[in-house]
């Protein structure tokens, strides 16, 4: 269920998904960008009426967007066995380093309809992130990785991440991204600590539901 529908009761959504499973049309169902509060309600409804709850949530997760996966959802992993299928691991391409020296003419941000992304990149926060990307690129180079592999492996190192969605637009990009798995051993505790020292944005703890 892609994005919560505030006009539809969660019980109705859970029943609809359960019926699809009973009919054999789908095997499982999940959510995307739901809050911890909405997920908790979905599980409560499923348990109360003997229905099938969602088995996964699809949140945005990368080195610059960490709150949901690392804080808000933290109580849900053990409580419900929730898994996450995360999207935008490269932060819309920012973590590839291709925007470090400006916006390439053939990049996504240069396309019509992506003015919002350009504005975000050119904001003060965006400028700070680009400086962090440069430092991350230096670290990646020191351990023999391209920066986008570093960013992907960082996501994969989180035990609460079940699947990393690769937003590749070309077959060559997909093959290259998958090669990151050959370097999993390079994501050591020491490297993770160095990454934290660069981004300095680790969530402090579980957030309140809905925040």
Labelled PLM ranges:
Residues 2:
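Histidine-centered active-site/metal-ligand motif
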Residues 143, 202-206:
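Short secondary-structure junctions and interdomain/linker hinges
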Residues 5, 10-197:
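Beta/alpha (TIM)-barrel catalytic core signal, keyed to glycine-rich beta->alpha loops juxtaposed to Asp/Glu
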